[in-house]
Amino acid sequence: MVNAEKRQIAKRLVERFLACEITNDEFNDTFPRDKADPALEAIYSNLWSYYDEQHTHKLDGRHTLQPETRGLFERCAAFLASGLEYEWPSYNWISPKYGLMRLFGLSRKINDEFERFKTSGSFEVWPFIREADYRRALASR
């Protein structure tokens, strides 16, 4: 279920983080969560891996995002503004179990699980599931 109010807050946070207006800590501490809207959790947990949690910073200097990663953040903002339901299957981007599985030599299982996840839609436009949805969202901005 789309939580429009929380998505608007999340969208603005993603945009402000990209514009170097807020720090990683501000982004992390104020990003809204809602178990009834799986897009919020999926976007939060995916973006979490692209910034340093060890110290406070903005996305500039050595923390400047690569173009591909910047595109991911921009797609997330566009998705949050789209009003679309999140259609991807559940996937925990930051699960501690993956670290343990790698430690015990189960990397292939993790990779296979992720590859199955990616085939659920057009992964190049995640969090959109279809390229057409992404194009429509861009056209309406």
Regions found by a protein language model. Give the residues of each.
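Acidic, Ser/Pro/Thr-rich low-complexity regulatory regions
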Residues: 1-141
